[in-house]
Amino acid sequence: MDEQIIFCDGFEVVPSPEINDLILYECDQSLTNSEVTTDEEEDTIFSGGDSSSGLAAEEDSSGDKPLSFYIVKQPVYDNPEIKAKIDEANQEIFRCNELRINVLSAKKSELAEVSSLYTQMESLVPQSEGYRMVIEEKKKEFDTLLEALRNLRCTTSDQLCFTKEELDHLSYIAQYQIEYGSIGLEEEDWMLKETEKPDGIILSEKEASINRVKSMALELNEVKNELDAITWKINDLSDKLWKSQNNIRVLDLEKAHILEKRDRFYARIKMLRIQRDKGNAAFFQSLSVMCKAKELAASGNVRELEVFASSEVDRFMTLWNDDKAFREDYVRRISHSLCERELNEDGRIKDADLQIFWEKKVPVKTIKRSEKVHKMNREDSSSNSSEDGNVITDKRKKETKSDVIVYEKPKKKEEEIDEEALKERKREEQLEKARLVMERKRKLQEKAAAKAAIRAQKEAEKKLKAIILSCSHFFNECEKKAKKKAAANSTSPSESDQVINDEKVRTLAVSGKEKHQKERLLFPKQRSFRYKHRGSGTEALPKAILNRRKARRYWVWGLSSAALAVSLVLVVLLLR
C-alpha cells in the first residue's frame, strides 16, 4: 500500500513537524513487511510497506501524506482505597512470612536439641545396662557367701549370729526361758562349756567370709550409686526431651495459625484485585478495541479502520454527553496520565511561563511553612532552609532571563519540609479534635450526673411531701375527733383554763408595751407625720370571748410532733 497509516490514541492528537523522521525510526524497528510497531510514550502505531529497508527512501521520494486515525484510550485507574488495602494486606503477608521464618528457625533449634538429647541418651543406656549386669553378678556372689556363712553357723552352734535382729531374737528367747522356764544346773554347765570351747579353724573361716561379704557390700554400693547417677541423668534428659517436644508441638500450631492468617490475606488480596479489575472494565474494553485497530492497521484496510475509529469516537461522545458517571470516571482516569505528561485538562501542553510563575510562588510558601515549624521546634534549621530558598529563587530568576526556558521542580528538601510540616499540623489537629471530643464527653457525663442527682433529690422531696401530707392529714383527723369529744364532754370551760388564758393575755399586753417603749428610746427624735387610725377592735380579748374558747389538749400536739419526727428520721435513713 502506498499510503502510510498513523494510528493515534489519547486525549488529543498533536501533529509533529518531523513525521518522516518518526516513520523512519519506527520502520527500522519493524521485522516484517506488514508488521505493526508501537511507541508507548507517544501512543502511535505505524504500519510498514513492502520492504523495511527501503521504506524511508520511498516515502521521501513519493512524498505521500500518512493517514491518522483518532481512538479514545481508557487508561488504568488505580483506586487509592483499594491500593491502600492491598498494600496493608501485603504488609501483613510480609509480617506473617517473617513470623513463619522465626518459627521455623526456632523449630530447627528445638529439633537439633532433641537430636543431641537422643544421642546422649543412647550413650547412657548401654552403660546403665552394663552396671545392671555387674550388680546382678555381685548379688549372686553375695548370696553364695551368705549361704556359706549360714552353713557354718548351723554346723558349729545355733548361738552364732550374723545380724542384729537374730541376736535380739535369741536374747529375747533366753530371757523368756529364764523368767518362765526351768533349766537344770547340768544343762547350764554344758552351755557354759560349749561357749568356752576353743575352735580357731572355724572362727578364722568365719572372719574371712565376713570380710569378703563386707567388701562385696561396698562394691555393690558403689555400683548402685553409679547406676543411680546414670538413671538420674537419663530421667533429666527424658524431661528435657519431653519439654522440647512440647515446644515443637506449640511451634507447629503457631505455624499453622500463621499460615491460615496468611491464606486469609491472600484471599483478601485476590478479592480486592477482582474488585479493582471490575472498576477497570472500561480499560480492558479499550484494550480489545486497540487490539482490533492494530489488526486493521496491520492488514492495511484503511476504509474499515476509518469506520471503526469513527464509530468508537461516536460511541465515546454519546456516552460523554449522556452519562455523567461515565464522564466523571473518564476524568478521574485521565487526570493521572495528564499530570505525568504535563498536560492540562483539555489536553494541551502546560504553559512554561505559568509553570515558572507557580514555581516562584511555591518555594516562598515552603520557606514560610518551614520557618514556622522550625521556630516551634528547631531555630537553627530555619536559617538554613531560608538561605536555601533564597539561593533557589536567585537561580530561577537567572534562568528566566536566559533564552531557553527550563521547567525545574522544587528541591526535595523543601518538599520534605512541607510534608513534615503538614504531618505535624495534621497530628496537632487530630490531637485537638480528640481533646475537644473528650471534653465534650466529660461535660455530657457531668450534665447527666447532675440531672440524675436533681431527679433523685426531687423524687426524695416528693416522697417526703407525700409522707408529711399523710401525717398531717392523719393528725388533723385526730384533732377533729378530739375536738368533737371535748365539745361533747365539756359544756363550759374549767376555772383553771380561764386563769391560764388570762395570764397569756396579760403577758402579751406587757410584752407589747415594753417593745413600744424600747422603740421610743432608740428613736426619740423621729416623728411620723402620718395620722394613725386605730381600729375599732380591742387589743385584749374580752372575758366573754375568752370564756367561749375551747380547751386545747397539748398531748395531741406532742404525739403528732413525735410521730412526724420519727417519720422524718426513717425517711432520712432510707435515703442513705
UniProtKB/Swiss-Prot annotation:
InterPro entries: PPI1-4 (IPR055282)
Gene Ontology terms describing biological process: regulation of proton transport
Superkingdom to which the source organism belongs: Eukaryota
Keyword Amino-acid biosynthesis appears in the UniProt entry: no
Protein's cellular compartments: Cell membrane; Endoplasmic reticulum membrane
Keywords, sorted A to Z: Cell membrane, Coiled coil, Endoplasmic reticulum, Membrane, Transmembrane, Transmembrane helix
Annotated spans, Disordered: 34-63, 369-395
Signal peptide: none
Residues annotated as transmembrane: 555-575
Keyword Translocase: no
Entry GO terms, CC: endoplasmic reticulum membrane; plasma membrane
Feature: compositional bias, Basic and acidic residues: 369-381
Segments forming a coiled coil: 132-155, 205-241, 411-467
Record membrane topology: Single-pass membrane protein
PANTHER family for the chain: PROTON PUMP-INTERACTOR 2-RELATED (PTHR32219:SF8), RNA-BINDING PROTEIN YLMH-RELATED (PTHR32219)
Biological function: May regulate plasma membrane ATPase activity.
Family: Belongs to the plant Proton pump-interactor protein family.
Protein name: Proton pump-interactor 3B
Species in which this protein is naturally found: Arabidopsis thaliana
